[in-house]
Amino acid sequence: MFEDLTIPRIWPIGAILFNLLFLLIAIPIEGYIYHRRLNFDKKTSIFYAIAVNSFSGVIGWVIFFFVEPVLPVPIKAELINYIFFNIFRSTNTQGVLIFTTFIIFFSTFLMKFFLLRLFVFTLSEDIGKKQEEPQPFYRQKVRFISRIRLQDTNLVTTTLIANSLSYTAITIILLIRNR
């Protein structure tokens, strides 16, 4: 699989620049939503937005590069035409594109949620600190479970809102670009 690994002679500069543009659009929008809804300070919310979008972008490209070689030839041809020339040759490609867009949106949402949850848990300042006043075990367990449930619900809705707004902004830019 990796025997034919060479640097390509033709670079999809348009796709690379649009990916950079999408990151530059998504990070401030999602950082603002994290700041407002999760009550992070601005620096922390932007850090989480950068981390979540960077990791999800890298994971998305890795998935793309593993899926692309197994695609049927007509879909590969349409993909190459769209990436390099911004045109579709086939008329039924738009249905596949809409279906693929929904899959990408929800998989990105799930990826961002789990990444944000991982980052919030691992980068929390409360980990490793001693509690000043020990509480009874049962009370402590109930508080911890209720806090985790509330935090998960809040993270899910916040991630969904942030992802939806950033995808909406990106879609508007794509519509403006194609006119």
From Swiss-Prot:
Disulfide pairings: none
Membrane topology listed for this record: Multi-pass membrane protein
Keyword presence, Kinase: no
Keywords assigned: Cell membrane, Membrane, Transmembrane, Transmembrane helix
Coiled coil (residue ranges): none
Entry's transmembrane regions: 10-30, 46-66, 96-116, 156-176
The keyword Repeat appears for this protein: no
Signal peptide: none
Cellular location(s): Cell membrane
Pfam families, per database record: FraC
Main location class: membrane
Top-level taxon of the source organism: Bacteria
GO cellular component, one term: plasma membrane
Entry protein name: Filament integrity protein FraC
Organism of provenance: Nostoc sp. (strain PCC 7120 / SAG 25.82 / UTEX 2576)
